[in-house]
């Protein structure tokens, strides 16, 4: 009598089609209560810039320079980019302000889909990801790989903190749906 080894044993509950083909058992994905820790990743990330060229031109040591934020200012950003961004931010703030409110008043977006932010004194292209969450429409939601179309309804929320706000001493955090 011949005994099947564990590697050649098959599970008969995986017969899903008419051809009696075996499909491997794949565990169902579950994102609900997972905590993921990245040990070797960079602490801060840099927003991509149109003026930097291709992704190969990006210096990999940019994220290491952040350990001394008072010495390096904005890192690899050009001064002209900073001035243009600051000018645009000032123009937008003046256009959106009414005569009855102070210049430093916080402006909140009326749309639910937009991010809620505060105006910054300086423009920073560096940010830190605090958390990424998945918004569940219902507890019956399936996590099949074929079912990724369901994620388009604002399914993930990202919390971010900017480097500028940390340097200024106060933390400004915002969330957005992607």
UniProtKB/Swiss-Prot annotation:
Biased amino acid composition, Polar residues: 1-13
Spans annotated as Disordered: 1-24, 47-114
Name the record gives this protein: Uncharacterized protein T19H5.4
């Amino acid at each position: 009598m011949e005994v099947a080894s564990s590697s050649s044993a098959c599970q008969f509950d995986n017969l899903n089609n008419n051809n009696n083909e075996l499909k491997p058992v794949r565990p169902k994905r579950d994102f609900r209560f997972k905590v993921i820790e990245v040990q070797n990743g960079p602490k801060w990330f840099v927003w991509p810039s149109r003026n930097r060229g291709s992704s190969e031109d990006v210096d990999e040591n940019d994220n290491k320079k952040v350990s001394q934020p008072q010495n390096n200012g904005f890192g690899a950003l050009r001064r002209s980019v900073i001035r243009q961004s600051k000018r645009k931010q000032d123009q937008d703030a003046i256009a959106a302000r009414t005569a009855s409110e102070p210049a430093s008043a916080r402006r909140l977006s009326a749309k639910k889909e937009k991010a809620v932010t505060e105006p910054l004194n300086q423009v920073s292209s560096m940010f830190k990801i605090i958390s990424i969450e998945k918004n569940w429409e219902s507890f019956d939601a399936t996590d099949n790989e074929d079912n990724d179309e369901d994620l388009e309804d604002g399914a993930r929320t990202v919390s971010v903190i900017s480097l500028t706000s940390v340097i200024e001493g106060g933390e400004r955090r915002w969330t957005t749906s992607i």
